[in-house]
């Protein structure tokens, strides 16, 4: 590759990167180009569509090189617990270590996935905001249907509390108390709580974490 430069193909569209080489030009959308650098993004809600794309990207990057780290950038208000757990389980299942970085805002399942990164490799930028709370669900139908859904929400709450406790080093009782209502934190407060390992001011701060330089 001799050179690359960004060009916006249209207002509101994803930028395209044009790479020039001896073989000519090749165009990539910016996210596909960054995927080649083993960078995966979650931007927006956690849902079936975003989860299927992220799971596929993680599996693809593992097949490309099972020994090289993957970087997962998160700016998400959360969303579906089930779809979030699909991403979480895949992160733990694959061989490459996955580092996580919060840019902007991580809440609910977004925060859960932030904590799911490899220990020592979970980061937030200094002005990121991070929020934890208990899962919620709306129930409709007969009384029996509502009861079934309520039991499922309680199961998910207990399961997620246990997993969050394991990822943060906090007790299950602490997690249950602190997630009873929306609980917003600064990046530094999230570090103190155990949701992330470091708050990064600049890329140079990654000097102690060379895995993000090794692409």
From Swiss-Prot:
HAMAP family: ClpP (MF_00444). Signal peptide: none annotated. PANTHER family: ATP-DEPENDENT CLP PROTEASE PROTEOLYTIC SUBUNIT (PTHR10381:SF70). GO terms for molecular function: ATP-dependent peptidase activity; ATPase binding; serine-type endopeptidase activity. Cleaves peptides in various proteins in a process that requires ATP hydrolysis. Has a chymotrypsin-like activity. Plays a major role in the degradation of misfolded proteins. It comes from Paraburkholderia xenovorans (strain LB400). One of its GO terms (biological process) is protein quality control for misfolded or incompletely synthesized proteins. Fourteen ClpP subunits assemble into 2 heptameric rings which stack back to back to give a disk-like structure with a central cavity, resembling the structure of eukaryotic proteasomes. Its EC number is 3.4.21.92. It is an enzyme of class 3 (hydrolase). Keywords: Cytoplasm, Hydrolase, Protease, Serine protease. InterPro entries: ClpP, ClpP/crotonase-like_dom_sf, ClpP/TepA, ClpP_His_AS. The gene is clpP1. It is found in: Cytoplasm. This is ATP-dependent Clp protease proteolytic subunit 1. The keyword Cytoplasm applies. One of its GO terms (cellular component) is endopeptidase Clp complex. The active site is at 108 (nucleophile), 133. It catalyses: Hydrolysis of proteins to small peptides in the presence of ATP and magnesium. alpha-casein is the usual test substrate. In the absence of ATP, only oligopeptides shorter than five residues are hydrolyzed (such as succinyl-Leu-Tyr-|-NHMec, and Leu-Tyr-Leu-|-Tyr-Trp, in which cleavage of the -Tyr-|-Leu- and -Tyr-|-Trp bonds also occurs). Belongs to the peptidase S14 family.
């Amino acid at each position: 590759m001799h050179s690359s430069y960004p060009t916006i193909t249209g207002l509101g569209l994803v930028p395209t990167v044009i790479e020039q080489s001896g073989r000519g030009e090749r165009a990539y959308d910016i996210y596909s180009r960054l995927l080649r650098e083993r960078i995966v993004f979650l931007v927006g809600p956690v849902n079936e569509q975003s989860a299927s794309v992220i799971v596929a990207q993680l599996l693809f990057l593992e097949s490309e090189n099972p020994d090289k780290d993957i970087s997962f950038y998160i700016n998400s208000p959360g969303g579906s617990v089930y779809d979030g757990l699909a991403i979480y389980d895949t992160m733990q299942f694959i061989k490459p270590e996955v580092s996580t970085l919060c840019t902007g805002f991580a809440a609910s399942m977004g925060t859960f996935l932030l904590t799911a990164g490899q220990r020592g490799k979970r980061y937030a930028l200094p002005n990121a905001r991070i929020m934890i709370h208990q899962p919620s669900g709306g129930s409709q139908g007969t009384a029996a249907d509502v009861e079934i859904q309520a039991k499922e929400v309680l199961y998910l709450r207990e399961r997620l509390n246990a997993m969050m406790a394991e990822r943060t080093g906090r007790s299950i009782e602490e997690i249950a108390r602190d997630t009873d209502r929306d609980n917003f934190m600064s990046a530094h407060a999230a570090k103190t709580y155990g949701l992330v390992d470091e708050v990064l001011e600049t890329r140079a701060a990654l000097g102690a974490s060379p895995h993000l330089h090794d692409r």
